[in-house]
Amino acid sequence: SYEVGDLMILSDHINLIPNPLIGQNIAELGPRFPDMSETYCPTLIEKAETIAKINNIPVQKGVYIALTGPTLETPAEYKYMRIIGGDTVGMSTAPEVIVARHMDIPCFAMSVITDLGVPGKIKKVTHEEIQKVSEVAEPKLTLIIKELIASI
């Protein structure tokens, strides 16, 4: 159960944005059909969870769904995303991770829960409100990322 302001480590994603690898493949960068069975690096996830625990920062772990935006989701879209296995929704991250994995770069990602798409908790939200929630969560997120980078 997520709450506004929670941090979430991405364990996987569902990409509903056009795939950035569509088109001619550049073989020097990676294979035509890159494996995505381990999209997010388990070692980095484990290290981040340890860092969060040491610093008393609660984190969630879940599946991120990437959409094109720029609209926020409808209640029916939120329902659909829960049905297909998503925990959170955003308008970025997955395309960048797909490109990085194509190049065999280990990936790690986190999100801030800025609003809730759960029945009974869906409410009108503005971009400014989303930014405010993100600003409050930013110091915790930054601490985890800085310590994770230092541990590599």
Regions found by a protein language model. Give the residues of each.
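Glycine-rich phosphate- or other oxyanion-binding loops that anchor nucleotides, phosphorylated ligands
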Residues: S1-I152
